[in-house]
């Protein structure tokens, strides 16, 4: 059966590609002698000797979706966004512990599709504790279409501000991305651009001026130095490592 053969080959390639991406992420996570092997047709066993923060490791390994850069709609206040969310909640749409967060986000946008401005969607930045439980949700109203994607990004890395030696994330865009990024930053000085992964807002830095050469930096303010450095490392890793070809479910 040709269809079965093609499907099997696609599954095998997806597993192999996932192993490559996971290995890349784990290597950058700083684990010595990790073991990453396929088991059966659709399972990958990952062993990380010495890693104590399992939830953080899961979070970094399991980022699955396409990386997108989307403008935040600054014309709508947070007060208005919360009014919309309260409306959805009264109509039975709220996040229940244990369910997929993407299910909640999809339900919110479906419920509010006649209320939100045309061409906009709601997305959230999540803060989680050591147990992986959501402790804080920050809503953002975003452009429904991405201005840039991870395909436009050449590289991302941790670097340090020359004046105050604060950790930040440096990004280099490819030629196409550099042109688009230059135009976007010129037109949106003072506004926020969200970095979106798997439909979730990972960060929403402010555009401080036109960036014409495809090289940008993301500053991480309002935190301790240790937290800034951790966030810079995590964000650079997410930007650099790319997307997994399949959805991962942790067993």
Residue map of PLM features:
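Conserved actuator
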Residues: 209
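Extended, hydrophilic extramembrane loops/domains of integral membrane proteins
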Residues: 212-251
